[in-house]
């Protein structure tokens, strides 16, 4: 059973990665209306080879991969619930994975049938990364990563725990601003990075405000991550799981900043934009794992005593 769970969890992560990619691809290519206003089929029927368009194919493939991924997520949640029922995080994570998967699908359906509001659709990506993070956490528990890094003896102080919780919430909000940039079509509102023509110019449109706000949010996120990394290396250097996680988070945020800048300089190159979406998804999952470790800190302290 354990071997099956390991293989299935990896396959589920791969499937959900494809879904995240697919959703970003739909947005980047403007394929959201590729299947008309019917759901789950395209214009009420399966796609026929005689009337295939790139937009229709992208949208239909996204719907199909979402459906396949739903099966993987539900099976993983049920099996983890049964096999790891003694782990206190298992049931909440399984519920979150399935619940947010359903919410994600319903939001996608609503956008197709009743139209797309950019502020609501920006939440669609946020919902998907919560589902993704919960699946990654289940997989890490299945692979017993805690034992390999001796995370069961990890004890965090209040200051670090609060920073990790707050940073994760803030990262989610920063992700929302990035999704809003896409859905408000503000990617090229300020065509030079970090400011317009190298100088700060007062925004004059909604798109300008959205773009500037996202860049400010990203800058704060980078500074905050650097601060938390400094805290970890100052006070918790002996815990490999923390030092490794923070170094990895800095790698992710550096790649995120680079792909963000390149997205502007390349006129939103499709592959760079997709990488930009995937990197922040992985960073958020990593921060959620740190939240999981932080939530265990008190019980670890009592157990060690």
From Swiss-Prot:
Q: Where does heme b bind?
A: 214, 276
Sorted alphabetically, the keyword list is: Cell membrane, Disulfide bond, Heme biosynthesis, Iron, Membrane, Metal-binding, Oxidoreductase, Transmembrane, Transmembrane helix
Q: Which Pfam families match?
A: COX15-CtaA
Intrachain disulfide bonds: 35-42
Gene Ontology molecular function: metal ion binding; oxidoreductase activity, acting on NAD(P)H, heme protein as acceptor
Q: How does it sit in the membrane?
A: Multi-pass membrane protein
Cofactors per UniProt? heme b
Q: Tell where it localizes.
A: Cell membrane
One GO term under biological process is: heme A biosynthetic process
Record field: catalytic activity: Fe(II)-heme o + 2 A + H2O = Fe(II)-heme a + 2 AH2
Instruction: Give, as in the UniProt entry, the pathway in which the protein acts.
Output: Porphyrin-containing compound metabolism; heme A biosynthesis; heme A from heme O: step 1/1
Parts of the chain on the Cytoplasmic side: 1-6, 85-92, 144-160, 234-240, 293-305
Identify which residues the record assigns to the active site.
59
Q: Does the keyword Disulfide bond apply?
A: yes
Q: What is its main location?
A: membrane
Which Enzyme Commission number(s) are on file for it?
1.17.99.9
Q: Of which family is this protein a member?
A: Belongs to the COX15/CtaA family. Type 1 subfamily.
What name appears for this protein in its UniProt entry? Heme A synthase
Q: To which species is this protein native?
A: Listeria monocytogenes serotype 4a (strain HCC23)
């Amino acid at each position: 059973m354990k071997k099956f769970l390991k293989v299935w969890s990896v396959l589920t992560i791969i499937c959900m990665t494809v879904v995240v990619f697919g959703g970003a691809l739909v947005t980047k290519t403007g394929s959201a209306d590729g299947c008309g206003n019917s759901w789950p089929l395209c214009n009420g029927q399966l796609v026929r080879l005689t009337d295939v368009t790139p937009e229709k194919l992208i949208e239909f493939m996204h719907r199909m991969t979402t459906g396949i991924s739903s099966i993987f997520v539900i099976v993983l949640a049920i099996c983890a619930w049964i096999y790891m029922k003694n782990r206190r995080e298992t049931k909440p994570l399984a519920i979150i994975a399935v619940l947010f998967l359903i919410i994600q699908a319903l939001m996608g359906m609503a956008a197709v049938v009743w139209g797309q509001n950019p502020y609501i659709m920006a939440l669609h990506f946020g919902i998907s990364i919560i589902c993704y993070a919960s699946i990654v956490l289940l997989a890490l528990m299945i692979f017993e990563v805690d034992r390999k890094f001796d995370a069961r003896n990890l004890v965090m102080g209040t200051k670090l725990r609060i920073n990790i919780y707050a940073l994760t919430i803030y990262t989610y909000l920063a992700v929302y601003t990035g999704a809003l940039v896409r859905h408000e079509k503000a990617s090229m509102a300020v065509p030079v990075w970090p400011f317009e023509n190298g100088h700060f110019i007062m925004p004059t449109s909604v798109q300008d405000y959205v773009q500037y706000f996202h860049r400010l949010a990203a800058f704060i996120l980078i500074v905050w991550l650097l601060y938390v990394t400094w805290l970890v290396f100052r006070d918790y250097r002996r815990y490999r799981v923390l030092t490794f996680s923070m170094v990895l988070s800095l790698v992710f945020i550096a790649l995120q900043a680079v792909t963000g800048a390149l997205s502007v300089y390349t006129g939103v190159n499709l592959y760079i934009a997709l990488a930009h979406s995937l990197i922040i998804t992985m960073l958020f999952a990593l921060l959620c794992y740190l939240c999981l470790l932080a939530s265990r800190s008190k019980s670890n302290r009592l157990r060690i005593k």
